Design a protein with these regions (language model features):
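Extended alpha-helical interaction scaffolds
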Residues: 1-289
Length: 290
């Protein structure tokens, strides 16, 4: 070829290879060029991406080098040494910053999905959407971390309220069951078996100290599910009480009292008469449990 690369130029080119992260021995410069260009493309691809990350950098310099071949390509690389080195270092730094901040962004999105029914959700969601629209993941100061902290605090308080309500309801139902005469007639083994069968063991503590623990807790049982579990407590304990009666009196008949909205004395008397008739009829067949 008419283009000659001097030993001094080759030394500088090999140093650039090393700086980019592609080892290169003497006389391997042309053979290692595809690996160098692939490495640069990889670095560029990690320096951007889907919002809220910055846009993927343009590859104008890489494409200019790729457009050449042979010694002309080496010369192009040599002439662009400082530019390529700066781009490589900049892309690597940006990629590291993206990798550092992106987990918090993903965690924010995951947690916001659990906050849809909470009052501040619209504000938090709007702020997250602004970060995404403006691709401001790497802005200084960090816009994601404070938003994540606010979302975590909101959800932690909401979950605590649901847990407190569940634990209070559990304690109330447990106290009522322990006062029940039929339940107390059972042996310890029978009570233990019914407790296990009807899932009446006290709920374990729920760890929410870190965003990851909070996420796991909500994924396992979200806010709405805690409400449902609390509402289901009376029926669970009542089922255990009925089972206790069944063990003591196998022929017992369970009677469901009809539910009504009573507006006056006359309706009350009519309802009481209806309930009395229902119970008396069932008593003819054996013991009755209400």
């Amino acid at each position: 070829e008419s283009i000659n690369i001097t030993p001094i130029q080759l030394i500088k080119i090999r140093k650039l290879f090393d700086a980019v992260g592609v080892p290169c021995q003497p006389k391997e410069e042309l053979n290692r060029m595809p690996a160098l260009l692939a490495k640069l493309r990889e670095q560029a691809s990690k320096a951007g991406g889907p919002a809220p990350a910055p846009e993927t950098p343009k590859l104008t310099v890489i494409e200019a080098i790729e457009a050449q071949s042979g010694n002309a390509q080496l010369l192009e690389l040599f002439n662009r040494h400082d530019e390529v080195l700066a781009l490589s270092q900049g892309w690597t730094k940006t990629a590291a910053e993206i990798a550092k901040r992106m987990p918090a962004w993903h965690k924010l999105g995951d947690l916001l999905r659990h906050a849809k029914a909470l009052g501040p959700y619209a504000k938090l969601k709007a702020e997250a959407e602004a970060i995404e629209a403006q691709r401001s993941l790497l802005a200084d100061p960090d816009p994601v971390r404070p938003l994540l902290d606010e979302t975590v605090d909101l959800l932690r308080q909401a979950l605590k309220a649901k847990l407190d309500a569940f634990q209070q309801g559990f304690a109330q139902q447990q106290a009522l069951l322990q006062q029940d005469a039929d339940w107390n007639k059972l042996g310890n083994t029978q009570r233990d078996e019914l407790t296990a069968k009807h899932h009446l063991t006290p709920p374990p503590a729920v760890a929410t100290g870190t965003p990851e623990q909070l996420q796991d807790a909500l994924d396992d049982c979200d806010l709405d599910h805690w409400v449902s579990k609390t509402q289901a407590l009376p029926s669970r304990f009542e089922a255990a009480r009925h089972a206790a009666v069944q063990l003591l009196k196998p022929n017992v008949v369970h009677v469901a009292i009809p539910k009504r909205t009573l507006n006056d004395e006359a309706e009350l008397k009519a309802w009481l008469a209806e309930v009395e008739t229902l119970i008396r009829t069932k008593l003819e067949s054996g013991p009755v449990s209400l």
